[in-house]
Amino acid sequence: ESQSIKQTVDQLKSISIPEATQHRKGYRPWGWYDVLEEGDTFKVKRIYVKPGESLSLQRHSRRAEHWLVIGGEATVQLGETVLHLSTGESVYIPKREIHRLKNETQNPVYIIETQIGDYLGEDDIERLEDIYGRGK
């Protein structure tokens, strides 16, 4: 049976199916993300942030992002500005802008993140502060 799985994965790789080599769901200390759709210059994720948790204070050199809150209440730092976003509200994050999302409530936060740029790898991140001890 494991040989059959390997053959299936090899077939998927041969026709360039991204799921053959990339996980669509990623787990992080603050919650998780699920890649809903992606192309050469865009990626759409659903992101869940646990109560009391936050993403790194970070910036990206090769992509802009748009965050739409679809559940809960998020606190967003965008440069020196702090925004409080509720369900249905959104924020645009230009390339190289310092930003962070926090969930300061007792309820989950869900957002849709749309990334736009010429490179969308998870390694396009400069962490300026990270409460989980992840490197810059």
Each language-model region and where it sits:
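A short glycine-rich, His/Asp/Glu-containing loop-to-beta-strand
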Residues: H23-A64, Y119
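A generic "binding-loop/recognition-motif" signal
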Residues: E53, R62-R63, T81, E97-I98, ...
